[in-house]
């Protein structure tokens, strides 16, 4: 056998894909943004509140200004593939963080294959991908919490390599 065996505990997978739309105001615009996310994922989105008042933008503290959805499993791979197709499978190296996560934005949701509805309008959105290896839950669970070793963590280089291998992506400087 010439093929090298791979340790299943070292394989990297998507822990979750977070899709975020900031409407910058509560009310009808936020509801329309929530409708777009619901059409895209089939899940009910959650609203996010502003942390502080920014007078120049007209945002008050605790005002609902954004919606987001967390997707995991097979659906996360499908949505990520669709979003990367819009970006032509090219990401900047600065999109990757040191802890193995990466994110990028899309300017128009109609590029993802959703039909344009004049009542909704056009929204841009951000995609954040959190990568993990098996055993990551050890550091998150409530009972018998422990540290994850350095070999088991996902770093920026691992995330870049995973992106290039799984999606045949291109890293741009």
Swiss-Prot record:
GO terms for molecular function: rRNA binding; structural constituent of ribosome. PROSITE patterns: RIBOSOMAL_L5. Its main location: nucleus. Keywords: Cytoplasm, Nucleus, Ribonucleoprotein, Ribosomal protein, RNA-binding, rRNA-binding. GO terms for cellular component: cytoplasm; nucleus; ribonucleoprotein complex; ribosome. It comes from Encephalitozoon cuniculi (strain GB-M1) (Microsporidian parasite). It is found in: Nucleus; Cytoplasm. Component of the ribosome, a large ribonucleoprotein complex responsible for the synthesis of proteins in the cell. The small ribosomal subunit (SSU) binds messenger RNAs (mRNAs) and translates the encoded message by selecting cognate aminoacyl-transfer RNA (tRNA) molecules. The large subunit (LSU) contains the ribosomal catalytic site termed the peptidyl transferase center (PTC), which catalyzes the formation of peptide bonds, thereby polymerizing the amino acids delivered by tRNAs into a polypeptide chain. This is Large ribosomal subunit protein uL5. Component of the large ribosomal subunit. The keyword Lipoprotein does not apply. GO terms for biological process: translation. InterPro entries: Ribosomal_uL5, Ribosomal_uL5_C, Ribosomal_uL5_CS, Ribosomal_uL5_dom_sf, Ribosomal_uL5_N. Belongs to the universal ribosomal protein uL5 family. Pfam families: Ribosomal_L5 (PF00281), Ribosomal_L5_C (PF00673). SUPFAM superfamilies: RL5-like.
